[in-house]
A protein has these predicted regions:
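Nucleotidyl polymerases of mobile genetic elements and RNA viruses
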Residues: 1-165, 169
Length: 169
């Protein structure tokens, strides 16, 4: 086990260490897959998310899949992988661009590092809902904003929540 004291003196940290028999750690750290930091989350701590998506792609035989099958994998697997992190923290736009480039290359070409000029539809059009002529792929930037706005909505409409007094991102 480990304990991470926040705004505690060294005496309190050593008391925690001796009383709980746990290692005392410090920030930044990873908790439930989320990189936690006292300051803004550095891009380097979000690179494991990009690696996780790349490992997922490596297991699929993309050359054997039709474009429709790749679209289904993009919509239901690849776009869903970063949702847990998007709900809690603001991801650096450079990391989001890397993820969206990986998704785009997989969708259109079935491989990584494809030429962007050979895409059949622009990315903003692709991210539109099906009812509006798009393919229903999530725009990760807008998804992150909407997920974090959900916390603000719950804070405004339900003051009985235990985290109501906390400052939200």
């Amino acid at each position: 086990c480990s304990a991470t004291p926040i705004r505690c003196d060294e005496e309190v940290a050593s008391t925690i260490d001796s009383t709980l028999a746990c290692a005392v750690t410090s920030f930044p750290l990873v908790y439930l897959g989320l990189p936690l930091s006292v300051r803004k989350t550095p891009s380097s701590s979000l690179l494991p998310l990009v690696d996780k998506i790349m490992r997922k792609l490596a297991t699929w035989k993309a050359a054997l899949l039709t474009r429709g099958e790749r679209l289904a994998l993009v919509r239901h697997v690849l776009s869903a992988m970063p949702v847990h992190i998007l709900m809690a923290i603001v991801i650096n736009p450079s990391i989001l661009k890397k993820i969206m480039r990986i998704i785009r290359d997989f969708l259109w070409h079935g491989r990584r590092n494809a030429r962007s000029g050979s895409c059949l539809v622009s990315w903003p059009r692709l991210c539109r809902p099906i009812e509006f002529g798009g393919l229903g792929v999530r725009d990760l930037y807008l998804t992150g904003i909407s997920l974090r706005c959900r916390w603000l909505w719950l804070k405004a409409t339900d003051p009985a929540r235990p985290w109501h007094h906390l400052q939200l991102p």
